[in-house]
Amino acid sequence: MEERAVKLAVYGKGGIGKSTTSCNLSVALAKRGKKVLQIGCDPKHDSTFTLTGFLIPTIIDTLEAKGYHYEDIYPEDVIYRGYGGVDCVEAGGPPAGAGCGGYVVGETVKLLKELNAFDEYDVILFDVLGDVVCGGFAAPLNYADYCVIVTDNGFDALFAANRIAASVREKAKTRKLRLAGLIGNRTSKRDLIDQYVSAVPMPVLEVLPLVEDIRISRVKGKTLFEMAETDPSLEPVCQYYLNIADELLARPEGIVPRPAEDRELFALLSDFYKTPVREPALV
């Protein structure tokens, strides 16, 4: 029996680098011989920018233009080929201050199923905006096998990671969803990450170093893999994403996380800042 697609949902604090991480991870998965579809789930519709080099039309825009006649839409109307052979879709979003992001994600999945697109891929990756602030934006977890949380070594990102972990736990009550683990993005230290996972046990898939080219790649509209074609010094950075891809393709058991209570986590992480490890005084 043929294995079904691995479905991943990537979450994290707003601005933490989810889309940059998602695009590089998608290319890494493609380099492992997998057919990959990345679905951007953010009203800004810029998730796939570093794969395609431009802002592709959204599914919601296309549906509106076609009067929501699904039968008039073809795969080439909504699926765009990006770098490394990664296929890209942008869900789009409702007008600012109106509508529900979860509805948009649902319509996107509905259309892709109508087009039999889900059957064409080995990996489907949902790149989801910011923190899980409502049930609507937790909607991609309804379709995912694994959640991946992008963080850094800071208080706010880990606080958001804990809230996302709570959403995973809630969704896991009714479906086979697991947390694959954390990805530390662009950080020179990991002490606060380690402090967090010691209190809230969960896997750490990888911690990427504080490399400026990771940020620059977003501005250039290129993945690290594409930049490495002309700058081989970036190949070791690409290896981090390949390592993550290998871990996810192994279909890990994952976990149902047990997030900390907000006050408990606040105390844990703030105490870390209040009582830093001091260097021994020179005599």
Curated annotation (Swiss-Prot):
This entry's comment on the bound cofactor is: Binds 1 [4Fe-4S] cluster per dimer.
Q: Its catalytic activity?
A: chlorophyllide a + oxidized 2[4Fe-4S]-[ferredoxin] + 2 ADP + 2 phosphate = protochlorophyllide a + reduced 2[4Fe-4S]-[ferredoxin] + 2 ATP + 2 H2O
Among InterPro entries, the record links this protein to:
NifH/chlL_CS (IPR030655), NifH/frxC (IPR000392), P-loop_NTPase (IPR027417), Protochlorophyllide_ATP-bd (IPR005971)
Name a single GO biological process: light-independent chlorophyll biosynthetic process
The record's annotation in Gene3D superfamilies points to: P-loop containing nucleotide triphosphate hydrolases
> What residues bind ATP, as annotated?
G15, I16, G17, K18, S19, T20, K44, N185, R186
Residue sites binding [4Fe-4S] cluster per the record: C100, C134
* Tagged with keyword Magnesium: yes
Give the protein's cofactors: [4Fe-4S] cluster
MF terms from GO for this chain are: 4 iron, 4 sulfur cluster binding; ATP binding; metal ion binding; oxidoreductase activity, acting on iron-sulfur proteins as donors; oxidoreductase activity, acting on the CH-CH group of donors, iron-sulfur protein as acceptor
- Entry EC no(s): 1.3.7.7
Q: In which pathway does it act?
A: Porphyrin-containing compound metabolism; chlorophyll biosynthesis (light-independent)
Claim: Cell inner membrane is one of the keywords in the record: no
Residues annotated for Mg(2+) binding in this entry: S19
Q: Which UniProt keywords apply?
A: 4Fe-4S, ATP-binding, Chlorophyll biosynthesis, Iron, Iron-sulfur, Magnesium, Metal-binding, Nucleotide-binding, Oxidoreductase, Photosynthesis
| HAMAP family membership | ChlL_BchL (MF_00355)
The entry assigns this protein to a family as follows: Belongs to the NifH/BchL/ChlL family.
Listed under subunit, the entry gives: Homodimer. Protochlorophyllide reductase is composed of three subunits; ChlL, ChlN and ChlB.
Protein task: Component of the dark-operative protochlorophyllide reductase (DPOR) that uses Mg-ATP and reduced ferredoxin to reduce ring D of protochlorophyllide (Pchlide) to form chlorophyllide a (Chlide). This reaction is light-independent. The L component serves as a unique electron donor to the NB-component of the complex, and binds Mg-ATP.
Supply the name of the protein: Light-independent protochlorophyllide reductase iron-sulfur ATP-binding protein
Taxonomic lineage of this organism?
Answer: Bacteria, Bacillati, Cyanobacteriota, Cyanophyceae, Synechococcales
